[in-house]
Every structure is written in structure tokens, then in C-alpha cells.
């Protein structure tokens, strides 16, 4: 997996304080997300009872040295102990003066969650009788209302602990007021990412997989890149998509959007989508997008084949 920032730029930190509530499925990476926010300078609290969130906000705002950003993790256990209290608190936070609220929801597919629990050898908090799959499905149903309310939904399927921390490091930076644009290449045979805002399918382009000389390579290799971009449709596609994104991105930034994710998919996620995502990043990073943004590229399935 690859994640890089070809042309990051910086803007001043936002003036309003941030309250970030992280919730989602058990095993989806909430602890790693919390560490990423902590590394970014946020004041972080794990498993805080929801009714105490306004008190923490009040104490932070009342102190001259109080943190500019507070992050709270709430999981299924808190929901079972305190019922729908988190939703009520979020409703109250919406109107808090001087604060900007973000509700982040983490999820992953069943196979990823099961694998993580097997590797950690820890019990699922919602499991009864050791049936992890049923616990995951039950939790998914129970947390569906919170997912619908989330400002950002992040799918961590297939990501390592380090990848999750990197992902949330970018997100933590984006909440300071900059717009973070992420270009994600992927393979449809591995499933489309769930957390993209816009998705482009490049399977209409000739597939380098069928060229024996190119098959072992990836879209980051010059030979594959040249083969993909040699096709007139590929060049026109890149130009049209760059034009669309160049129009959209400054307008999203002006509206206060802080995170914009673009998916580029081919069959396996190793050749066409990688080459196109890299070319889009190169073009957009070369002055095609107005405003100040952070631009990242991630190749989700580069090593999957």
C-alpha cells in the first residue's frame, strides 16, 4: 500500500475549537485513530461517558491554555450503558458557540473485523457465546443510526494498524481548516471503497495485465504508465476529470468541506487505476486546483494482484 503527499500546502489553523467524536464498529481502528489525533496535538479521551462531553468542552473553553481540539471515543459499550445519550449530546453540541463538531464513524467489512479479532485474541464486546460474526452484524445494525449522522465515514477494510494511523493523521490535519483531497486507486474485484465521495471506473481502457512484459509491473512503473496514457481515451479521460476536479475542489473548500476522497478503479487495482491516479495527482498538484489543499495518493490494492 502506498500513501504520499505530492504537493501539500498549509493554511492557518481554524479559529473555532474542534470537538471530534469517534465511534463505529469494534475492531475498525478507533484506538489507532485516537492515537493519530493525539499525535496531531488534540486532547484525547477514550470511552468518556457521553454526558461528560459538554463538561469537557466547557473546561477547555474556560481555560486560556485549553486545547483547541478535543477528541472523544464512544463505542458500543458506552451505547449499551447509556442508551441513546450520545445522540442527545451530539444534538446539544451542534448549537455550542465557538465549537465545530465532527462525528467520525469507522467501519470495515466482516472478513477484516474477524481477522483482526483472531489476531488480537481479544473478545468482541458484543459477542455472546463467542460468535464473533453474529456480534459484528448485531453491532452494525445497532450503530446504523449513528452511521447515518456521521460527518465522515471511514472504511478501514484491509488496512494495517499503521495505515489506519496514517489515514487519520491526514484527517486530523484536514480538520485544522485545510481541504484534504485523497486519490485512492483500487481494484473492483477486491470491492469498491465505501468512503469515497466520487468514483471513476477506468476499466474501459486497455488492460496492461494481458501484456506479459507489463503484467509483473504496476502503474507506478514508467513502462505501464506510458502504455496506459498512450491510449487517446486515457489522455482525454485525465483531461476531463482534471477539469471537473479543478472546478469542484475550490468550491468544496469555500463551503468549508475538509475531506474529499476520489476513487479510481480498475479490475485488479495494480495497473490502470494506479497510473491514472498518479497522473491525476501530478496534474492537479501542478497548479490545476485553486485554493490551498493537501493532496494525497493511496494505492489500496497495489500489492493484492
Curated annotation (Swiss-Prot):
It comes from the Bacteria. GTP binds at residues 75-78. The keyword Transmembrane helix does not apply. Keywords: ATP-binding, GTP-binding, Nucleotide-binding. ATP binds at residues 24-31. PANTHER family: RNASE ADAPTER PROTEIN RAPZ. Transmembrane segments: none annotated. Belongs to the RapZ-like family. It holds the Pfam family RapZ-like_N. InterPro entries: P-loop_NTPase, RapZ-like, RapZ-like_N, RapZ_C. HAMAP family: RapZ_like. This is Nucleotide-binding protein Rxyl_2009. Displays ATPase and GTPase activities. The keyword ATP-binding applies. GO terms for molecular function: ATP binding; GTP binding.
Amino acid at each position: 500500500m502506498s500513501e504520499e503527499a505530492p504537493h501539500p500546502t498549509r493554511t492557518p489553523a481554524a479559529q473555532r475549537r474542534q470537538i471530534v467524536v469517534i465511534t463505529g464498529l469494534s475492531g475498525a481502528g478507533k484506538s489507532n485513530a485516537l492515537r493519530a489525533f493525539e499525535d496531531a496535538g488534540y486532547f484525547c479521551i477514550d470511552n468518556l461517558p457521553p454526558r461528560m462531553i459538554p463538561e469537557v468542552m466547557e473546561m477547555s473553553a474556560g481555560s486560556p491554555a485549553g486545547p483547541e481540539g478535543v477528541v472523544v471515543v464512544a463505542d458500543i459499550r458506552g451505547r449499551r450503558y447509556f442508551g441513546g445519550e450520545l445522540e442527545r449530546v451530539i444534538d446539544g453540541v451542534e448549537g455550542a458557540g465557538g465549537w465545530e463538531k465532527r462525528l467520525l464513524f469507522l467501519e470495515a467489512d466482516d472478513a477484516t473485523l474477524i481477522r483482526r479479532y483472531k489476531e488480537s485474541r481479544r473478545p468482541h464486546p458484543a459477542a455472546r457465546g463467542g460468535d464473533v460474526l453474529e456480534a459484528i452484524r448485531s453491532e452494525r445494525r445497532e450503530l446504523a443510526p449513528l452511521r447515518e449522522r456521521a460527518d465522515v465515514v471511514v472504511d478501514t477494510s484491509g488496512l494495517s494498524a499503521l495505515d489506519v494511523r496514517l489515514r487519520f493523521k491526514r484527517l486530523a490535519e484536514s480538520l485544522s481548516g485545510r481541504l484534504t483531497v485523497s486519490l485512492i486507486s483500487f481494484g473492483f474485484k477486491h470491492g469498491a471503497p465505501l468512503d469515497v465521495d466520487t468514483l471513476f471506473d477506468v476499466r474501459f481502457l486497455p488492460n496492461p495485465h494481458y501484456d506479459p512484459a507489463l503484467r509483473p509491473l504496476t502503474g507506478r512503473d514508467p513502462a505501464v504508465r506510458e502504455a496506459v496514457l498512450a491510449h487517446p481515451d486515457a489522455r482525454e479521460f485525465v483531461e476531463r476529470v482534471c477539469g471537473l476536479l479543478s472546478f469542484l475542489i475550490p468550491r468544496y473548500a469555500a463551503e468549508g468541506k475538509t475531506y474529499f476522497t476520489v476513487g479510481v478503479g480498475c479490475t485488479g487495482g495494480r495497473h490502470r487505476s494506479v497510473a491514472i491516479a498518479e497522473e491525476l495527482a501530478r496534474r492537479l498538484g501542478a497548479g490545476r486546483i485553486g485554493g490551498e489543499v493537501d493532496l494525497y495518493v493511496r494505492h489500496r490494492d497495489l500489492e493484492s494482484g
